[in-house]
């Protein structure tokens, strides 16, 4: 995953699992939590806030 992932929109995906993960919000310039459905989505999804901040901030 490269830094371009940080510019992708938040993508929940079509599945119905509820995993708390993080994405980089380019509007607020912060890593924020969201509920990920568990499948598909994109690369702007991180297991921890620290992983998100390491790549995107």
Curated annotation (Swiss-Prot):
Pfam families: Kunitz_BPTI. GO terms for cellular component: extracellular space. Residues 6-56 form the BPTI/Kunitz inhibitor domain. Keywords: Disulfide bond, Protease inhibitor, Serine protease inhibitor. The record marks 16-17 as: Reactive bond for trypsin. PROSITE patterns: BPTI_KUNITZ_1 (PS00280), BPTI_KUNITZ_2 (PS50279). One of its GO terms (molecular function) is serine-type endopeptidase inhibitor activity. Disulfide bonds join 6-56, 15-39, 31-52. PANTHER family: KUNITZ-TYPE PROTEASE INHIBITOR-RELATED, TISSUE FACTOR PATHWAY INHIBITOR. Seems to inhibit trypsin. This is Protease inhibitor. The lineage of its organism: Eukaryota, Metazoa, Ecdysozoa, Arthropoda, Hexapoda.
